[in-house]
From Swiss-Prot:
GO cellular component: cytosol
Protein name: Putative N-acetylmannosamine-6-phosphate 2-epimerase 1
Top-level class of the enzyme under EC nomenclature: isomerase
Function: Converts N-acetylmannosamine-6-phosphate (ManNAc-6-P) to N-acetylglucosamine-6-phosphate (GlcNAc-6-P).
Catalytic activity, EC: 5.1.3.9
Length: 233
């Protein structure tokens, strides 16, 4: 299952809907060393009306592509210590994601030191030179990073990393302020991070974002169970 996704076509597909993040990392209950369980999550998301999928690793992306014909925001989480960025942190991960036909490649666009020694604008330029038609999403943690990444040529800006860097707001809530400020610059914003309740989804859309990614609240059973159990402890 594959089709050509332009920026306009992708926006038309995901605008106003829910993109479901289907991820499981080693050590988590839904991670299986022998085969990916994420296609089951993706199929359930499709049946519920999801407009797209966010997935991690070539293995999961390929498996998901076999069962749903939705656009996929793809990432590869790979540590490069001592540097902090680990979401599609080098061209190696970009090459792997392009090879498996990922619709949109998301990457860490924070201004933290990178393993490859490049600044974000240089990384974006290298990707665009090598893959001029590849759609890109910058995962950022604050306004300056979002504006910088968009000016450097990304197609979408995600609020994914707000709360996960020392230069961003530390909160258990979604960063609604960042969503609004980015959207006010007419940037196609994909809201992501700590969106746990339907009311938060509605609020994100009221701020002018293009689309919304929801992950743990839908596809991480341990997190979902803990949210209930913690209120009765």
């Amino acid at each position: 299952m594959s089709q050509i996704w332009t920026k306009e076509k992708f926006i038309s597909q995901v605008q106003g809907g829910v993109i479901v993040s289907c991820q499981a990392l080693p050590g988590e209950a839904l991670y299986n060393e022998e085969f990916s369980l994420m296609p089951f999550m993706a199929k359930a998301a499709l049946e519920a009306g999801a407009v797209g999928i966010r997935a991690n690793s070539v293995r999961d992306i390929k498996a998901i592509q076999k069962v749903v014909d939705l656009p996929i925001i793809g990432i590869i989480k790979r540590d490069y210590p001592p540097q902090e960025p680990y979401i599609t942190a080098t061209m190696k991960e970009v090459d792997e994601l392009v090879e498996c036909g990922t619709t949109v490649i998301a990457f860490d666009a924070t201004l933290r030191p990178r393993y490859d020694g490049l600044v974000v604008s240089e990384f974006i330029k290298k990707i665009k030179e090598k893959y001029p038609n590849q759609l890109l999403m910058a995962d950022v943690s604050n306004l300056d990073e979002g504006l910088y990444a968009f000016k450097s040529g990304v197609d979408f800006v995600g609020t994914t990393l707000s709360g996960y860097t020392s230069t961003s707001v530390q909160s258990d809530e979604p960063d609604f302020e960042l969503m609004k400020k980015l959207a006010d610059f007419n940037i196609p914003v994909i809201a992501e991070g700590k969106i746990h309740y339907p009311e938060q989804l509605k609020k994100a859309y009221s701020l002018g974002v293009t689309s919304v990614v929801i992950g743990g609240a839908i596809t991480r059973p341990k997190e979902i169970a803990q949210r209930f159990i913690n209120v009765i402890k």
